[in-house]
């Protein structure tokens, strides 16, 4: 029996008048535009269709046959990627209609219908694998994010992602993190400053790195510095860093870092973030917990497509 999808609860959102599941947060009002992701989806289709197209479907299915299909969850998780799936089908044939039943950001149970499809049978079969590839991967990212978000519930820590994304998929993976209730760190090297260990080594120290940045970028740019010792933390604070990344520190050292910082900078914990450790890290008092594994190693969610 089909299970009803539910949206992960957030006080700032309510269900629509129609009672359909609604996304997690206001950020979802602006998912990646079709123009932005179309090159990614088109590349995936070209890769799959090759030189001759879908030779199996074209040989078996009459050109004028229409079909009705459903995309359904085969395990519990958080949905993401419908925007890419819809575009995949429409690039194959614009007449394919995808109707979401559990929008991106919805929490679903096994058997929940995520979306319905109507249109030419050939187009649905041809676009199936590419569409599902986006859904299973991005839903996996959203689900992994949601698990960490739930694990730190009741603390002040927020879960954020990193630049450790799969090449070409960053905008979609970061969207999937938001679907799971997480936040995005910088999108690229051009939109935020983060002084990392190799910058510090090359520049001759934390203070020297911050001084060089201030001289070039001015006082209005927020500077974040990666540190792995208390001495580096104190140097970063003295030099005026507004945010500090605590790299691979144990929770007890993080607590000490929080006490020393005393609100002078925001603190981000990073490195070795696991489901088992994340609660203790959050309880240290840090503001953010960043995880590269959310995007580079998330397990795919089991989702299938069936004709009905």
Model-derived regions, located:
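Acidic/glycine-rich phosphate/pyrophosphate-binding loops and surrounding catalytic core
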Residues: 2, 6-11, 20-239, 243, ...
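C-terminal active-site rim and adjoining tail of enzyme catalytic domains
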Residues: 248
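Active-site loop ensemble at the mouth of alpha/beta enzyme cores that anchors a bound cofactor
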Residues: 304-308
